[in-house]
Amino acid sequence: MTLSRRFLILGTICLLYGTATAQSMLADAPKCAIDCLTELLSQKEYAEMGQEAMCSSEPFAKATGVCLMVKCSMRQTMDFIKESSAACGIPPTNNTTSYRVNSTVVFAFALVFFALRIVTKFRLGLTWGIDDTLTTLSVAVMIPYYIVLQIMLALGLGLDMWFISDSQIILIFKLFIVIEVLYLTALVLVKAAILCFFLRIFPDHKFRIVVKCTMVFNALIWVGFFVFVFFQIQPFSLFWNGWQQKKGHLILTGFTNFTLPLAGINLLLDIWMLILPVTQLWGMGLKLKKKLGVISMFSVGIFLTIVAAIRVRELVAFLLSQDLTGRHFQSIIQITS
């Protein structure tokens, strides 16, 4: 590196970190990051920038990011982001504790309502149906889901990606596959339980055919997910180490092409399942007030529809984010609901 280039970089780091630490920061900064700063600061539009302008300039941030992705490894890039964020006074994301509390509260509520269902079933001597079995299975699946989620939080889920070690990131991505499989399995079981409940209480022949077709469609969603997960990305290890090889775009493209449509289909299926009982309840020989009351009881599932809509929004935000571990929890916390 020429003396003039070294002074140029030293001046930049003085702006970012202060003169007292400039020499040490220069020694610690990756050569690729220094090269990027040199390249950018030689351009007219960035040459006269001060610290505040550098920290607040979106074009400068984007240009730096593009250069780092080309010239640096992912770890070098993340280390530089961590240092520059501290220099610019950008606080690190750390919502792990609040997320752990939120997920625990939601999971506890789910267990309480399930326990109330079981107690009521036995105290009143009600018949145990297939829908009860499927509901029990869904809760059984959600227990390991919750445990895996807590492990992911302990590893750094909810923190900025650049504050987590490579081994932690890899393990989080591996557990991400596990948690998605558990989530979709629980979701399919819950919907199957609701559809079986419809079959138990509504005798109309045509309606029952429609419900059974809906059950088949619900099962196909589950099968389609597994086909995607295990056959879309080859080699399969790209799911957890593709980010190191700068092949993460292949994974995100796959998720964009499949996960978003899947979330949209699930949302439409939720809406369809809200409409199904209404078609039967509306024809009952009840007064309007009682009819609306019964319909409102069956419409409690609108909560799941709202959750599905939030999931679509959060998946879009997750796929567009560069901070995969920091953003990932917003796309996952509502799953526990």
Model-inferred region functions:
Residues M1-L26:
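Fungal secretory targeting signals
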Residues M25, Q76-T77, K206-I209:
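Residue-level recognition of alpha-helical structural elements
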Residues A29, I34-V70, N94-L155, I170-S337:
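Eukaryotic multi-pass alpha-helical transmembrane domains
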Residues V66, K71-S85:
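Extended, hydrophilic extramembrane loops/domains of integral membrane proteins
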Residues S84-T97:
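Short, aromatic-rich amphipathic segments at membrane interfaces
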Residues L159-I172:
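Juxtamembrane helix-capping/reentrant segments at transmembrane boundaries
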